Curated annotation (Swiss-Prot):
InterPro entries on file: CAF1B_HIR1_beta-prop, HIR1-like, HIRA-like_C, HIRA_B_motif, WD40/YVTN_repeat-like_dom_sf, WD40_repeat_CS, WD40_repeat_dom_sf, WD40_rpt
Protein's name according to its UniProt entry: Protein HIR1
Main localisation: nucleus
Function, as annotated: Required for replication-independent chromatin assembly and for the periodic repression of histone gene transcription during the cell cycle.
Key words, A-Z: Chromatin regulator, Nucleus, Repeat, Repressor, Transcription, Transcription regulation, WD repeat
Gene name of the record: HIR1
GO MF annotation list: nucleosome binding
Domain of life of the source: Eukaryota
A family per Pfam: HIRA_B
Length: 861
């Protein structure tokens, strides 16, 4: 990739520079049209610009034109948009003077017009002057076949023009605010408009007779809360017709580019990477083959197999942050990020048809040129195959063919007349027969042939003989009503309820319809009706009657799936909160409980004995899973926890004074409302990283950060959220691995050498190796250390607290705890415990050393 910033490629007059608002490339890749604040449209020569990419000293070449080919100044205000027609014949320009001009290149040399530059090489004349808008015109777009043109502006109007006569076809005022962008579907079925009312409206148009338009869908979800400070909302449609890139979208508090899928019109993907609102997105007009990362050198018929059949599309996005990002549909991260590529906001972008050059305009009056090497984005598929990807949406090749001259249209009419002359005029006579004869309809011929084949008389040899034959016997199919099965009577089963009344027991309807048997009966009756002239209808056998009667009279239904012969093995586990008798007597408020339905296996004495021995637990309605997650984390067994204070901003440091890294955590909401999705959507957690006093990254998280720690050995930040998730990021903000969900609140994070130790609220320990990014220890319980004394009663008291944790050289976990004896005024004692990875249990450090020494002695002996 090369970046060109030429001093003469800008809108400049004398000593003053003007903002450039728009640019567009002609279909033949020979001209670049730009417009800006000076109210002039400038046409540049692209081949002359590209000579500077190959030769930096090309300014000394006299053959290179370092000025515009033409400069047009017919607008009375700033030029906000210019667009070449797809056939390259016209150039449309819109301005804040509310006038839409249609330009056409004039062949030959003519006298310069008033107001035009006398040194212009090309001369563009205004063919039509369209007046219909009541305010600034913001964007213009042509249909792929140049049949219609759509213009939008600040007057909320969407005006559709005829592409050949430039008459106004229709006007829509469906938006509630300024309309700042419009784009056409490459399959020529839709066009989309973007407005400051935070919506995108999809219009469907049909070219059946008079063109009709209708609003297909309204997209609002990606643009909730989007800022209204952007001057443009320039959309772009992918060349395969599958996606729309819409700038100035929002993902929480972050400005993004929304990728909208065709058909569903949903936005499952957002391009996140811009600090300020985006104003323009532009798809590369070429489709590229997807290159595998692990491409092999194997060949099949002399061709490499490293390239798959899947394709990629390239999209560029930019806006007020002066940053250009180039994305690929197959990668989650941008291919290219060029920061501060311009001095001010970027207003427009345009690709050449071959997809190798990108032009960028900015408010700093510069026009930036980016040139890409061959196969830098991948191997581009031929342009003819682009149409094949659009065929699934109904596009045809005829809609993409443009008549170049009047002679071409005359030749096409002559070709149509030639085809009509070659049509066989005797086709109707051949079908109906010669005059004077009556031909039998084709359907009767087929029936007569079939009847002849069944009777064995052979085929007819002449059409005249069929008229003398007997009229064919046609079977008439009559609709038969569903008859009840003979021998089966509807039996109602009466039951007696508790109060002595009789009720009809319900019959399961699963066997009321047997798909297999009903289908067989329908097929059998149809076959019998078709062959009623050959053989009489047979009655069902007595065995079938008895089977049907049994199936309909049964009260049991077949299961929807097969069950094993011995049943399904189940295991029920849980807490016994109350005895059955107490639950029936106390828990039920219904006085009409049927005691006969309660199966009590134990006797009264056994129940009294159980209730006296065990402590009955009562379920507290406030102790729910939601309340556990919402409450503040419990740190009763930690002497020092690492939970962040519930403040606006919290700082964490790692490293030395000479090499200091700082992490700033700004939780968007308080922990009391951490599960309020709407509040988190509006105020996400913001994490800032600093190194040597300079900001190195900025990240947004959809959760509240509970604790964090840094590891200087691996230069990694570890963040834990209130939802039990861990994030591992480096000092540049890149994720070292996908987020890890533990399912428990992490109340302490500490590092030891290149390991990170996580202690959860449920007294479990996890250890990760940050060098290999692997899990070293998992689900190590602390309860054997915290509750070493036998528990008496129904309550457990923890008298020990964890003071510190670290990893040894043998990758064993060592804990230092303080123990306070109950009802004692003595100083707390310090205890040391070691979790041996080889023994998978807790032990004292001395015992572990003895075990290691004995093992070494056995090995040496």
């Amino acid at each position: 990739m090369k970046l060109l910033k030429l001093p003469w490629l800008q809108h400049r007059e004398e000593h003053k520079s003007y903002e450039v608002y728009t640019c567009d490339v002609s279909p033949d890749s020979q001209r670049l049209a730009t417009g800006g604040l000076d109210g002039k449209i400038r046409i540049w020569s692209i081949p002359d610009i590209l000579k500077f990419a190959s030769n930096p000293n090309a300014s000394t070449d006299k053959d290179i034109l370092m000025k515009p080919l033409s400069t047009m100044s017919r607008h009375a205000g700033s030029v906000t948009t210019v667009k070449f027609s797809p056939d390259g014949k016209y150039l449309a320009s819109g301005s804040d003077d509310r006038i839409l001009l249609i330009w056409e290149l004039e062949g030959g040399t003519t006298q310069p017009m008033f107001g035009a530059e006398s040194t212009d090489i090309e001369h563009w004349n205004v063919r039509r002057r369209l007046v219909a808008h009541d305010n600034d015109i913001q964007d213009i777009c042509w249909a792929p076949d140049s049949s219609i043109m759509v213009s939008v502006g600040l007057d909320r109007a969407i005006i559709i023009w005829n592409g050949s006569t430039f008459e106004k076809v229709k006007r829509f005022d469906v938006h509630q605010s300024h309309v700042k962008g419009v784009v056409f579907d490459p399959a020529n079925k839709y066009f989309a408009t973007a407005s400051d009312d935070r919506t995108i409206k999809m219009f469907r148009y049909h070219k059946t007779g008079e063109t009709s338009f209708s609003v297909e869908h309204v997209i609002t979800e990606p643009f909730k809360g989007s800022p209204l400070t952007t001057y443009f909302r320039r959309l772009s449609w992918s060349p395969d017709g599958q996606h729309i890139a819409a700038p100035n979208a929002m993902n929480g508090p972050v400005s993004t580019v929304a990728i909208i899928e065709r058909g569903t019109w949903e936005s499952p993907v957002s391009l996140v990477g811009h600090d300020q609102p985006t104003e323009v997105a532009s798809f590369n007009p070429r489709i590229f083959k997807r290159q595998k990362d692990d491409s092999t050198t194997d060949t099949i018929d002399g061709k490499k197999t490293g390239i798959s059949d899947e394709v990629d599309c390239i999209v560029a996005s930019s806006g007020q942050d002066k940053t250009l990002a180039v994305w690929s549909t197959s990668k989650a991260r941008p291919l290219i990020v060029a920061q501060d590529i311009c001095g001010k906001s970027i207003t427009d972008m345009s690709w050449t048809p071959d997809g190798k050059i990108l032009f960028i305009t900015s408010l700093d009056s510069s026009i930036v040129v980016l040139t890409f090497e061959d196969n830098e984005f991948g191997e581009a598929i031929p342009l003819e195959q682009n149409i094949e990807y659009l065929h699934r949406y109904g596009v045809d090749k005829d809609s993409l063919v443009f008549p170049e001259t009047v002679e071409q249209l005359i030749l096409e009419d002559q070709a149509k007349n030639l085809k009509k002359s070659n049509v066989d005029m005797n086709l109707l006579e051949n079908r109906l027969g010669k005059p004077g004869t009556i031909a039998e309809p084709n359907i009767l011929q087929v029936r007569s042939k079939k009847r002849a084949q069944l009777t064995g008389t052979g085929n007819h040899t002449d059409n005249n003989t069929t008229s003398k034959a007997e009229p064919p016997h046609v079977n008439i199919l009559q609709v038969k009503r569903k008859n009840k099965v003979t021998g089966v009577t509807e039996v109602l089963h009466d039951t007696v309820v508790k109060n002595g009344k009789k009720r009809v027991a319900p019959t399961l309807i699963t066997m009321g319809h047997s798909p297999d048997k009903s289908r067989k009966r329908v097929i059998l009756s149809t076959a019998q009706s078709l062959n009623n002239t050959v053989q009489p209808t047979t009655k069902p056998a007595p065995e079938e009657k008895s089977t049907l009667a049994k199936l309909q009279s049964t009260k049991l239904s077949k299961p929807s799936f097969s069950i094993p012969r011995l049943g399904i093995h189940t295991l029920i586990m849980g807490f016994k909160e109350r005895t059955r008798e107490n639950f029936i007597n106390q828990g039920s408020t219904d006085s009409t409980v049927d005691e006969s339905n309660v199966n009590i296996d134990e006797g009264p004495q056994q129940l009294e004995q159980n209730s006296a021995e065990e402590h009955l637990l009562t379920l507290n309605s406030k102790t729910t899973l939601e309340k556990i997650w919402r409450d503040e984390p419990n740190t009763r067994y930690l002497e020092f926890n690492s939970i962040l204070p519930d403040a606006d901003a919290v700082l964490r440091e790692m490293g030395t004074i000479d090499d200091l890294y700082v992490l700033e955590v700004r939780n968007g909401v308080e922990r009391s409302i951490q599960f309020d999705t709407e509040a988190l959507y509006d105020n996400s957690t913001r994490v800032l990283g600093y190194h040597a006093g300079q900001r190195s990254f900025e990240l947004f998280f959809p959760d509240v950060v509970l604790t964090c720690v840094g590891c200087m050995e691996t230069k990694t930040w570890i963040l834990a959220t209130t939802t039990g998730q861990l994030f591992f990021i480096d000092t540049l903000g890149q994720a070292r691995c996908p987020r890890i969900s533990i399912g428990h609140k992490i109340i302490k994070l500490c590092t030891s050498q290149s390991h990170v130790i996580a202690i959860t609220e449920t007294a479990l320990i996890y250890v990760w190796d940050l060098v290999s990014m692997s899990l070293t220890l998992k689900n190590i319980p602390l309860l054997p250390l915290l509750a070493r004394d036998p528990i008496t009663g129904n309550r457990a008291r923890f008298t020990s607290k964890i003071k510190s944790a670290k990893m040894t050289e043998n990758k064993d976990l060592q804990l230092v705890m303080t123990d306070i004896a109950p009802d004692s005024d003595s100083n707390p004692s310090t205890l040391h415990f070691l979790y041996s990875s080889s023994l998978s249990c807790w032990c004292s450090p001395k015992e572990a050393l003895l075990v290691d020494a004995s093992v070494e002695q056995v090995i040496t002996s």
